[in-house]
Amino acid sequence: RRQRQMCIRDRSRSENQSNRYSWMMSIMRRLNEKGTTLALNILNSDSWGDNESFSLSKTTYFRLEDKLGNDSVLFRNQYLKSPQKNNSWRVGITFAQPIGKKMHFRVAYNWDTNYERDNRDTYELSSLTKSEVFGELPPDYEAGYVDSLSNRSHSRTNGHNLDVGLNYSDDTWMFNASLGMTPQKRAIERKMGKLYADTTMHTIDFQPMIWVNWKKKEARITFNYSGRTRQPSLSDLMPLTDNSNPLYITRGNPDLKQMFSHSVRVSFQHSKKGISANIGGQMEQNSVTQVVLYDAKTGGRETSPINISGNWNVYGSANWWKRLGHFSLRLDMNGNHSNRVSMINEDKSLEPKKSTTRDTGLGCDAVSYTHLRGPRD
């Protein structure tokens, strides 16, 4: 017979208040008759808020014993206050220069800064109020402040984005290519209970893009590729453990790597023959996923982020359209296939296993309809 690990009885109530504003300004000036332009852009946003919550819980652990040999019981009557504040600025200039009649050169620079503050203050009310009282703060609630269950998090990111692009256009070809590079300095200070950690990172992200279009009479072929690197969140990189909830413990991973996503698409269209088709796909390298470990005694979970590769998908579609007098026929076909990789721990072991989920979809739709003419005058 399967033995129960725990029994939880809880009540909770929360209130959240948030505020946000943003503004932007853009100024562009034409420098000469050839079309050389210079633009200035400024963007600012600010948000702040406060979350207050009450939590009353009683957890009985059937596989843990107290000093008297009985089932261990954890009783909590908590008040949590979580103020947050975010502020960001972006200031950039863009310079565009025609090169002849068919080509344009573009360079843009942006300076970005972002500040985030996320705190949590925890107060234990068990010894300050009656057990049946819920959702009310006693006058001396600050005496129940629990440092080990509270945290402080302050982070700032400063980045410089440089983007260089080239455009070309004539009667047959259209071409657009760009490369973006973003060096960043990211710093975070975090305190969880009595644990403290801070770190400063210097990273570089890249954003390549190419778009090519060929057109001749009624036929058109388009190719598009875009890529992007992305850094793990600073909170995931911190080597700290948050055990404020004993049944849901989270850990950081300072060894997380940079993620890289790719997207490609090719399309064909012939308007006179009424046919079109496209095929494409996406792929991710070093995606971040959560690994879950289970505690057999308490039934609790412990999660931490890791990198994993193997997430990709492909898709395609084709369309045919034909008009026959007052009738029209249309045939649509499409298909897709995805491959998703994750870490699972169904047997609640200490070694999670890699799991791959594959999905395939096919569709076909045929439509016929009649064109009706209105009465003549």
What is each model feature region?
Residues R2-Q5, R9, S57-Y79, R190-K194:
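A cross-kingdom feature marking solvent-exposed beta-strand/loop segments within repeated
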Residues Q3-R11, T370-D377:
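Conserved small/polar residues in nucleotide/adenosyl-binding loops
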